[in-house]
């Protein structure tokens, strides 16, 4: 894979899990990484690790649901690196509750972080990419729950399904400008969110019964898929949805 030297990518939810692994991997390929999250100590820790390894990173605190935070991230990113080449809309919020147990504020939180945050990332990321006029790549992190339903996932399915189609709409609209928009749909992954999903279940039994490859994904495997989509290796891909679930949705 060609390196990403002199390119700059914004990665939301970059303080832990998939976002942290993607930040480290993309930086290791020569890119400037702007990683954002709400938890400052997590973001600074990832930034420090990247810098200590001799790569380029800048942490900016951000709530992806706040429009002014997006303006600030773009402004600081352009001031620091001079250009933006892509955005990875990874920040997420999840609620594993039945409809009866869900409150409206629970539903809104999941929709706001996952769907509204992704919309704002698409909107402001596109504006920044346009400034250099050479196209770019926006990656939406959806979920297998953006493609199929499951019990106690009402808000998550609604939000992640919206992210999936937001990516397709963005691909249609932005293709003429060589701005590509694709979505990734992870299955069960070794993150805090993944652990919460299987809480109360026999995880080993769930995995063996539902995932043909017989294990969960690790965050690094999802990060490699993100790297592929932000790189020129995927230059003719837009509007695509890459499912990385070990065969969970193949049954």
Question: PLM features: residue spans?
Answer:
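Short, small/polar-rich loop/turn modules that mediate ligand/substrate recognition or access, typified
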Residues: 88, 175, 180, 237-239
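Active-site helix of classical SDR
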Residues: 122, 159, 167
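Substrate-binding pocket helix/loop in short-chain dehydrogenase/reductase
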Residues: 98-99, 106-111, 207
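Residue(s) in the substrate-gating loop at a strand-loop-helix junction
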Residues: 143
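Short C-terminal tail/terminal secondary-structure segment
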Residues: 148, 213, 227, 238-251
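Conserved glycine-rich cofactor-binding loop
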Residues: 15-17, 39
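Alpha-helical segment proximal to the catalytic Tyr-Lys
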Residues: 127, 172-176, 235
């Amino acid at each position: 894979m060609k390196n990403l030297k002199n390119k700059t990518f914004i990665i939301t939810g970059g303080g832990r899990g998939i976002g942290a692994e993607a930040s480290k991997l993309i930086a290791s390929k020569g890119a400037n990484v702007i990683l954002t999250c709400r938890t400052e100590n997590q973001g600074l820790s990832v930034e420090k690790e990247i810098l200590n390894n001799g790569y380029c990173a800048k942490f900016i605190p951000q709530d992806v649901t706040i429009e002014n935070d997006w303006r600030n991230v773009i402004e600081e990113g352009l001031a620091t690196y001079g250009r933006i080449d892509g955005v990875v809309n990874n920040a997420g919020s999840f609620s594993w509750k039945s409809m009866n147990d869900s409150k409206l504020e629970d539903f809104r939180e999941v929709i706001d972080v996952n769907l509204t945050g992704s919309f704002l990332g698409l909107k402001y990321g596109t504006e920044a990419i346009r400034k250099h006029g050479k196209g770019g790549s926006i990656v939406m992190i959806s979920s297998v729950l953006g493609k199929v339903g499951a019990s106690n996932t009402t808000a998550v399915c609604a939000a992640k399904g919206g992210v999936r189609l937001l990516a397709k709409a963005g691909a249609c609209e932005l293709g003429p400008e060589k701005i590509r928009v694709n979505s990734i749909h992870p299955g069960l992954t070794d993150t805090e969110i993944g652990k919460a999903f299987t809480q109360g279940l026999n995880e080993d039994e769930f995995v063996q019964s539902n995932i043909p490859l017989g294990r969960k994904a690790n965050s690094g495997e999802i990060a490699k898929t993100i790297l592929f989509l932000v790189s020129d290796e995927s230059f003719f891909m837009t509007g695509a949805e890459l499912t990385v679930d070990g065969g969970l949705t193949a049954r």
